[in-house]
Amino acid sequence: MRSSSSPFFLSFNSGPGMVLKAFFPTCCASADSGLLVGRWVPEQSSAVVLAVVHFPFIPVQVKELLAQVQQASQVGVAVLGTWCHRRQEPEESLGHFLEGLGTLFSHEPWLQLCRERGSKSWNCKATRRQGPTPLAPACEDQVMLIFYDQRKVLLSRLHPPAALPERQAGDATASAGGLAAVFDTVARSEVLFQSDRFDEGPVRLTHWQSEGVEASILVELAKRAAGPVCLLLACLLSLVSAASACRVFRPWPLSFIWSKLSTCEQLRHRLDQLTLVVSAHRAEGPAQLMRKANTLVSVLLDMALGLLLLSWLHRKDRFAHLAEALVPVADRVAEELQHLLQWLMGAPAGLKMNRALDQVLGRFFLYHIHLWISYIHLMSPFIEHILWHLGLSACLGLTVALSILSDIISLLTFHIYCFYVYGARLYSLKIHGLSSLWRLFRGKKWNVLRQRVDSCSYDLDQLFIGTLLFTILIFLLPTTALYYLVFTLLRLLVVTVQGLVHLLVDLINSLPLYSLGLRLCRPYRLAAGVKFRVLEHEAGRPLRLLMQINPLPFSHVVRTYRLPSCGCHPKHSWGSLCRKLFFGELIYPWRQRGDKQD
Amino acid sequence: MEDERSLSDICGGRLALHRRYYSPSCLEFCLSCPRISLRSITAVTCTVWLAAYGLFTLCENSMILSAAIFITLLGLLGYLHFVKIDHETLLIIDSLGIQMTSSYASGKESTTFIEMGKVKDVIINEAIYMQKVIYYLCILLKDPVEPHGISQVVPIFQSAKPRLDCLIEVYRSCQEILAHQKAASTSP
């Protein structure tokens, strides 16, 4: 229906006023005379030239080739006009011959490009018949020449990707906006570029690959080897995931521990990613391919960094030093905590505490620390072996090593976490009690049914006991609040350190290194758009422009191709965090995805 | 054919408007901003180094001086590459689109191209900027969903900030080409 070879078809948008744009590949600018082959886009009044067919040719064979290409690529390839690259003296016979071709391959409008050899002056003419009969007078359109680098346009990908139409029979609807249609045409016509000048085909073409099809031995070998390697890796990974899902790890204490450790989370994430990469399905589209490549490069870099870390640790027997330093450090931390508690039990910062409560709380926490120190001393002979075995896991990747570090920090500061929970629970109990008794003091009550504060008439003895309790609680508030404040600050410190480690792990997990490398080395592959440059212009000659690819900025590359990660983001805003701190609710600022609310 | 005029921007600095007419359907306007002056570079460098020397006499640490030199160099390079715009160009090609290029002092160029199918109109708009009312030229983009709506307003010559006389000239030329484009696109 939209076949461009019908002489009765007139484009509705391109009247005589609209300038005709001819997209011409730079590789064909020095080719010999011949026919122009490409696609005509009537909505934008543009002709995308894909190749030049040289003399001598047999018209029937040219038509056959074009039909084959049209079948294979779903692009409406047709003969658009003639190309003449001649010497200084115009050859009259050639001129008539070229015009005669117009009747053979009828196309509206018929393009005639002409260039003098060795000079930069071009001549363009586009003729269009104004009636159904061949004898009707022809009218000429203004032509604008736009040069484009065929190889770069073929390989590049526009962002944001225009909604590419599905492959339909016949000419694809150019619902893609103006320039996206050009990119789309060149990308789909790859089958036209398969033959080079060393082939013995019936038709001689010039296009970007006509000097010889490019290929790399390494890439071809890698492609051949990739199949069996992927199969082997996929089997191994399925074995590992089956082993991890087996019954041994199901019972409750173990599954609870696995869910809390960030190392397991990271290992699971890596396993998922690797399974995706080595799966046997082909990537559906360019986005999937980029994601696979990014994942692979990220995993390889991770392992390389991990091995580097391992070799550095082994070099000067650093494991032994670390193990030796670990127990004194834990001891030191416990000692500092004891000093802190002694300070709180006295008169901290000149404040006067309630002596009895102070002593109770202080002794309680001191006993905990005593237990903790004994536990650490119990473990100290085994520390070096444990550390050595954990260090081996660094060969699985730097992210795993960092996750193990974060887990070790959690385990070593477990007593701070316990103290924080005790302090917070005590404080929140006190605050709730205080608020309820304060309402009683004013003669009001919380209505659970209506979720609001209502007035209530209390008995005298209720009021008496309530006021007494209120007074007791309010006088004990500073002591509890101080303990709560101190332990919350310690807990926040530990959480900040862990958060930084997790941030680093997240960064390594989600950075799209392959895309960034591509943007650095082959910027034309990721295109944000195009840019034009006006070439030397002489009066009376057609306007010549050079179309270049405008590469995507680095920030957009990261944003578009960012890999999905474990999602370690702070779940609360600052306002809700402050509110929770004030009321003594427990906070878990860094939540992994899939954690249940406590 | 080419045309060059000397104008001023909203703060009184000198601008040069360079107009190139390639063909009835292709026009280019180039606005050159005032160059970076040696006086301001010298003033900033002297201030930073004096402050560093003052710190050095307090702390007796020679790292401060090397750090000051490093910071000055990096700051200058960063300023030339990311902040200081040398000239801004507007290229209008009938039936193709509008292209805006900013060239930085270090030679970096950042280009944006808007296809003609997305351009609704080019207008001069007023804005209140601190205590002044300024005029700026902007491109209105069509909304793909609503035929009479505007999806985005793209200002042109944002760092050169020329005055109304320059804007009127650019506006007239743009409107000529856009009118031609509209006539061509609506004719049967």
Swiss-Prot record, chain B:
<dbReference type="GO" id="GO:0006506">
    <property type="term" value="P:GPI anchor biosynthetic process"/>
</dbReference>
<protein>
    <recommendedName>
        <fullName>Phosphatidylinositol N-acetylglucosaminyltransferase subunit H</fullName>
    </recommendedName>
</protein>
<dbReference type="InterPro" id="IPR019328">
    <property type="entry name" value="GPI-GlcNAc_Trfase_PIG-H_dom"/>
</dbReference>
<keyword id="KW-0963">Cytoplasm</keyword>
<comment type="function">
    <text>Part of the glycosylphosphatidylinositol-N-acetylglucosaminyltransferase (GPI-GnT) complex that catalyzes the transfer of N-acetylglucosamine from UDP-N-acetylglucosamine to phosphatidylinositol and participates in the first step of GPI biosynthesis.</text>
</comment>
<comment type="similarity">
    <text>Belongs to the PIGH family.</text>
</comment>
<comment type="pathway">
    <text>Glycolipid biosynthesis; glycosylphosphatidylinositol-anchor biosynthesis.</text>
</comment>
<dbReference type="GO" id="GO:0000506">
    <property type="term" value="C:glycosylphosphatidylinositol-N-acetylglucosaminyltransferase (GPI-GnT) complex"/>
</dbReference>
<comment type="subunit">
    <text>Component of the glycosylphosphatidylinositol-N-acetylglucosaminyltransferase (GPI-GnT) complex composed at least by PIGA, PIGC, PIGH, PIGP, PIGQ, PIGY and DPM2. Interacts with PIGQ.</text>
</comment>
<dbReference type="InterPro" id="IPR044215">
    <property type="entry name" value="PIG-H"/>
</dbReference>
<dbReference type="Pfam" id="PF10181">
    <property type="entry name" value="PIG-H"/>
</dbReference>
